[in-house]
Regions:
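Glycine-rich adenosyl-binding loop in Rossmann-like folds that engage adenosine-containing cofactors
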Residues: 1-41
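Conserved acidic-Pro-Pro-aromatic motif
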Residues: 34-136
Length: 136
């Protein structure tokens, strides 16, 4: 699968968005669920920051997440998701709430700590943030 990047900001590489990217290279993409079937291991915590590819990563890790219920820190970008489709951010939020009982908006550098009780709590976001998802 191609990944698009620019030398000045490798952290902004994207599988979904080619705009303003000067470099393209092929990368192997595997589902976490498939990897763990071949290499069994317990998962206690996950960090997902994949520049708009969150839904696909969550789908590829669904069995793992439902089985182990790892704590999750996920970058969440409603403005980016709205470029994909108007309901994309809601779909991700609903998936997270189907697994996790507690979701908190902790900001980019953990400068905030707000309980997220509904999707409407996320709708005012004008930039990306991190969500901390747990069951305790």
């Amino acid at each position: 699968m191609p990944i698009f990047s620019e030398a000045a900001n490798m952290g902004g590489s994207s599988i979904l968005f080619k705009k303003n990217k000067s470099r393209e290279q092929m990368v192997e993409v595997r589902k976490l669920d498939d990897f763990l079937q071949q290499h069994p291991s317990s998962i206690g915590m996950m960090k997902i920051d994949v520049e708009g590819f969150e839904w696909e990563v969550l789908q590829g890790a669904e069995q793992t997440m439902r089985t182990y219920k790892p704590k999750l820190l996920i970058e969440y970008s409603l403005p980016l998701y709205n470029q994909i489709s108007p309901d994309h951010g809601r779909k991700i939020y609903q998936f997270l709430t189907s697994i996790y009982g507690h979701i908190r908006n902790v900001g980019l550098d953990h400068e905030i700590d707000q309980k997220v009780e509904s999707f409407e709590d996320l709708e005012p976001l004008t930039h990306h943030t991190n969500l901390w998802c747990t069951n305790d």
